[in-house]
Amino acid sequence: MSKIGKHPVAIPAGVTASVDGQTVKVKGPKGALEVVLVEEIQASLEGGELKIAMRGETPRHKSMWGMSRTLVANLVEGVTKGFEKKLEINGVGYKAAVAGKNLQLSLGYSHDVIYPIPEGIQIAAPKPTELVVTGINKQQVGQVAAEIREFRGPEPYKGKGVKYAGEFIFRKEGKKK
């Protein structure tokens, strides 16, 4: 029995959900999303709740059950609240600015890094050293944040680079004479 998979996903007011074979579609105030579930899993809409069930009892069925339920729950949360990831930029002269549909990053290279903002994602720079990535698709928000962090990940000696807000960077001591 999956601890996560056995719980139904509640559909809040203002959100509509539909199940068409293996496809679960959810529409809400922030937009619409859909996910195609694997063959081992079936979804059903019962009384304002989405229930996820296994089609068999193999270990693969059990492992896909909890994951599929979480994917559907993320759809519902995305179209109601949305998701956000905060990034911090540390380093002398390191900064970020949003220019139209591009993110311009100055990260200590001889050139500025230009990152085109994907469709469905919003990036805000409340301060030159802070970025907020928001959207309704949890996977896409996390992917964009990871791609931005990858341009100049935090280094362990001075802590310079792009890191997630609240992320702990293990610091190393420099060479001793």
From Swiss-Prot:
According to the UniProt entry, its GO molecular function terms are: rRNA binding; structural constituent of ribosome
Stored InterPro entries:
Ribosomal_uL6-like, Ribosomal_uL6-like_a/b-dom_sf, Ribosomal_uL6_a/b-dom, Ribosomal_uL6_bac-type, Ribosomal_uL6_CS
Where would one find the signal peptide in this protein? none
Instruction: Choose any GO biological process term that the UniProt entry carries and state it.
Output: cytoplasmic translation
Gene Ontology cellular-component annotations: cytosolic large ribosomal subunit
Which SUPFAM superfamilies does the protein's record reference? Ribosomal protein L6 (SSF56053)
Keyword Amino-acid biosynthesis assigned: no
Keyword annotations for this protein, in alphabetical order, are: Ribonucleoprotein, Ribosomal protein, RNA-binding, rRNA-binding
Similarity comment text for this entry? Belongs to the universal ribosomal protein uL6 family.
Enumerate the HAMAP family for this protein: Ribosomal_uL6_B
- How would you summarize the oligomeric state and partners of this protein? Part of the 50S ribosomal subunit.
This molecule's function is given as: This protein binds to the 23S rRNA, and is important in its secondary structure. It is located near the subunit interface in the base of the L7/L12 stalk, and near the tRNA binding site of the peptidyltransferase center.
Q: Which NCBIfam families does the protein's record reference? A: L6_bact
- The protein here is known as Large ribosomal subunit protein uL6
Q: What is the lineage of its organism?
A: Bacteria, Pseudomonadati, Pseudomonadota, Alphaproteobacteria, Hyphomicrobiales
